[in-house]
């Protein structure tokens, strides 16, 4: 009898204690800061646009987003850091097409990840329109005149790009194939080197990113002959398809990724926040004033762009000997 009373008493005490202890429930995502890895140096166009997007996402998510810059190796260092991060949604990346597409086309053994298997696409944010530019005093007033001259004078027109295997190099090769014109490719090491060479008269044409050239266009020093994507500030500058050619030229893009395997809840929250932030009208104006084009694409659309860009670049690389068949 005493044992029964004792057992009952212990049960009641334990039950009472269980009621007094608050139950630990899973908190909704996110409940702590998120890291955003940008695969470029502070102050670069991609860094600025990524930070602006992060600020808007903070308002939507109600949590801090800590930006970490990891530049180097054509964007693959920062991208690899995302791949190797914990698969919990608290580390995401903002790489360019370079680290996702072009680095593995040119030098696949140096890329330690497979974007198709190791990364979860969250959405494409923007495009950096690529251009064909000449000095304002150049004899060619439009792209057609440049092509006609290059056809009549094979190899005489020097075209600068930021290096072999860059998107601009691939655009040059596509342009030659489409038009039948023959240019001389002059690869540089990136940065402002192509623009400097154009202004100095060391090359006749620059295939590069628009944003660097806009101040010189406004100053009357540079003329843009071709865009890979239409820009409202340059309504009279055509894309190559507007000139009747059947294939578009690719543009540099910036997108957001997480490591593959993050929880579905985290993915859903991040994708929704990215889309809402990217489509914010005030943010869009800020970023487009830098010469870029905000054109949000869903994860599925981003996946399609990745595949198409890679297959096209790989085909060209094999054709011109940058990659073994």
Language-model region placement:
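C-terminal segment of classical bacterial N-terminal signal peptides
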Residues: 13-23
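Positively charged n-region of N-terminal signal peptides that target proteins for export
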Residues: 1-4
